[in-house]
């Protein structure tokens, strides 16, 4: 490929944005961009310098050969205000994500999205901001994806002492009844939530 450095930066930015808080490993970037390691390092250095020079709210960070976009520390006070601002109740989508995480934890964003069939990154971030979910570790394998789990706040908000008090999942559902199982699952979870209001 013979794109100029500006196009490479835009492509990398799009890839890292799509990857979210899990970021992308050097190996993944090399594979997707089809460049050699020296070219990748030049591209990533240029991306990093661009974020540092310009008045941007985000920066490029690297840890354990993984790159990700992160908010700059100097804007933490504003993020804190956002997190602490009063917010409306949970949407249907947020309840679905909470249900999935509460029963399947620890679980990665990709696994949540596979179950739901739609992107769930922003919902997960919102639930973390509301202190209903938190990072409980990192998955093994490439990228070391974040594992999510519920919090004490989740238990308090739903009137639970332990996760064992969650409504039981339907048992013995055939493979082609998975969608029906999911519908029952969310219906049961939502009913429990409504009962606690």
Curated annotation (Swiss-Prot):
Cellular component terms per the entry's GO annotation: cytoplasm
Pfam families with a match to the protein in the record: SMC_ScpB (PF04079)
Keywords linked to the UniProt accession: Cell cycle, Cell division, Chromosome partition, Cytoplasm
Cellular location(s): Cytoplasm
Single Gene Ontology BP annotation: chromosome separation
Matches recorded under InterPro entries: ScpB_csome_segregation (IPR005234), WH-like_DNA-bd_sf (IPR036388), WH_DNA-bd_sf (IPR036390)
Domain of life: Bacteria
SUBUNIT field: Homodimer. Homodimerization may be required to stabilize the binding of ScpA to the Smc head domains. Component of a cohesin-like complex composed of ScpA, ScpB and the Smc homodimer, in which ScpA and ScpB bind to the head domain of Smc. The presence of the three proteins is required for the association of the complex with DNA.
Record function comment: Participates in chromosomal partition during cell division. May act via the formation of a condensin-like complex containing Smc and ScpA that pull DNA away from mid-cell into both cell halves.
HAMAP family linked to this entry: ScpB (MF_01804)
Family: Belongs to the ScpB family.
Protein's name according to its UniProt entry: Segregation and condensation protein B
Organism per entry: Bacillus licheniformis (strain ATCC 14580 / DSM 13 / JCM 2505 / CCUG 7422 / NBRC 12200 / NCIMB 9375 / NCTC 10341 / NRRL NRS-1264 / Gibson 46)
Gene name, Swiss-Prot/TrEMBL: scpB
């Amino acid at each position: 490929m013979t794109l100029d450095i500006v196009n490479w930066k835009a492509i990398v930015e799009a890839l890292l944005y799509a990857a979210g808080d899990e970021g992308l490993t050097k190996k993944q970037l090399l594979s997707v961009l089809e460049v050699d390691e020296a070219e990748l390092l030049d591209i990533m250095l240029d991306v990093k310098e661009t974020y540092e020079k310009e008045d941007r709210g985000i920066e490029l960070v690297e840890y354990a050969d993984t790159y990700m976009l992160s908010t700059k520390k100097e804007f933490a006070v504003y993020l804190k205000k956002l997190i602490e601002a009063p917010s409306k109740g949970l949407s249907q989508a947020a309840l679905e994500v909470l249900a999935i995480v509460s029963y399947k934890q620890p679980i990665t964003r990709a696994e949540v999205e596979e179950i739901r069939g739609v992107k769930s990154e922003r919902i997960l971030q919102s639930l973390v901001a509301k202190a209903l979910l938190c990072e409980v570790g990192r998955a093994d394998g490439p990228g070391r994806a974040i594992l999510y789990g519920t919090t004490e706040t989740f238990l308090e908000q739903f009137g639970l002492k332990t996760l064992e008090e969650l409504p039981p999942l339907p048992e013995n559902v055939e493979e082609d009844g998975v969608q029906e199982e999911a519908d029952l699952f969310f219906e049961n979870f939502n009913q429990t939530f409504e009962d606690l209001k």
